[in-house]
Amino acid sequence: MSSKNNPESETKAKNKWEKVMEAEEEQEEGGGDGSQEMEPHREGLEFPSREKLEGQLTRMEHKVDEYKTQYLRAQAEMDNLRKRIEREKADIIKFGSKQLITDLLPVADSLIHGLESPASEDPQVKSMRDGMSLTLDLLHNTLAKHGVQVINPNPGDPFDPALHEAMSVQAVPDAKPDTIIQVLQKGYQLNGRVLRAARVIVAG
């Protein structure tokens, strides 16, 4: 008997064909293209809004400004430190000998007081005075080489509290008020800085 006239064979062939078709449909539904597989992942992504991005940009700009300000402040502090070190170095050069010169002032005072004593015709005393005068000149010249200036006002000069120290105030009819009557002790300054003010008597 041929298969065409066999109902059982026809049924088996039909069932087999249906299974093949079902398998192909399942493959199409399950496989699809790559875009369908990626779709669930795309749906899970969250992109920031424009406002959020602008806010982040603003915060970053503020941070940049803050760091720039800190840098400029640090640079200014370094410049100030460098200038201060340069000033201190210059002061050391200009006033490093201050203590030594201050210690020499009593020597100059002693020579000046000795020369202020009454003159004598005694040859020995006269020779001593000449030696003291030469020594004082030599001392003043040496001090001048190191930036020392003598503060020696004249009677009648205006009193300057920055350079003079008033030891007393006296009423003198012919003198103008606040003028120097007498110099008791010379003063000294080093490169414009007063080491010791001149001690004077002032008219009141």
Swiss-Prot record:
<dbReference type="Pfam" id="PF01025">
    <property type="entry name" value="GrpE"/>
</dbReference>
<comment type="function">
    <text>Participates actively in the response to hyperosmotic and heat shock by preventing the aggregation of stress-denatured proteins, in association with DnaK and GrpE. It is the nucleotide exchange factor for DnaK and may function as a thermosensor. Unfolded proteins bind initially to DnaJ; upon interaction with the DnaJ-bound protein, DnaK hydrolyzes its bound ATP, resulting in the formation of a stable complex. GrpE releases ADP from DnaK; ATP binding to DnaK triggers the release of the substrate protein, thus completing the reaction cycle.</text>
</comment>
<feature type="region of interest" description="Disordered">
    <location>
        <begin position="1"/>
        <end position="52"/>
    </location>
</feature>
<dbReference type="GO" id="GO:0006457">
    <property type="term" value="P:protein folding"/>
</dbReference>
<feature type="compositionally biased region" description="Basic and acidic residues">
    <location>
        <begin position="38"/>
        <end position="52"/>
    </location>
</feature>
<dbReference type="GO" id="GO:0042803">
    <property type="term" value="F:protein homodimerization activity"/>
</dbReference>
<feature type="compositionally biased region" description="Basic and acidic residues">
    <location>
        <begin position="7"/>
        <end position="22"/>
    </location>
</feature>
<dbReference type="GO" id="GO:0005829">
    <property type="term" value="C:cytosol"/>
</dbReference>
<dbReference type="InterPro" id="IPR000740">
    <property type="entry name" value="GrpE"/>
</dbReference>
<protein>
    <recommendedName>
        <fullName>Protein GrpE</fullName>
    </recommendedName>
</protein>
<keyword id="KW-0346">Stress response</keyword>
<dbReference type="GO" id="GO:0000774">
    <property type="term" value="F:adenyl-nucleotide exchange factor activity"/>
</dbReference>
<comment type="subunit">
    <text>Homodimer.</text>
</comment>
<dbReference type="GO" id="GO:0051087">
    <property type="term" value="F:protein-folding chaperone binding"/>
</dbReference>
<dbReference type="GO" id="GO:0051082">
    <property type="term" value="F:unfolded protein binding"/>
</dbReference>
<keyword id="KW-0143">Chaperone</keyword>
<dbReference type="InterPro" id="IPR009012">
    <property type="entry name" value="GrpE_head"/>
</dbReference>
<comment type="similarity">
    <text>Belongs to the GrpE family.</text>
</comment>
<keyword id="KW-0963">Cytoplasm</keyword>
<dbReference type="InterPro" id="IPR013805">
    <property type="entry name" value="GrpE_coiled_coil"/>
</dbReference>
